[in-house]
Amino acid sequence: MKKVEAIIREEKLRPVIEGLEEDGYFGLTITEVSGRGRQKGLTLQGRAGEYKVDLLPKVKVEVVVMDNDVAQIINTIARFSRTGEIGDGKIFIIPVEDAVRIRTGEVGENTI
């Protein structure tokens, strides 16, 4: 099993969720996060002049899937979240040793 973590633009969350659902993936976790990449935030122009925003609002999408589903999940998230601009985000793949369904105590791949 693998956990796919994607940090994406807030406005791309709905299209990503809909894309995952179209592909048959319904279980996910969403977390509002803030961060920055190589660009170190961004500089905006206001009435009082330029000002810097160090941390940008993003959304983290987490999906735990079987190893053979990872490529499809990555493709779907990338396809629905890509704008081609700086700040589109990142996707991370993390090994998952095991999983437990709290309600039943069931362990392993059947929990996902």
Predicted regions and their residues:
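Positively charged, small/polar-rich N-terminal and surface patches that mediate targeting and assembly
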Residues: 1-112
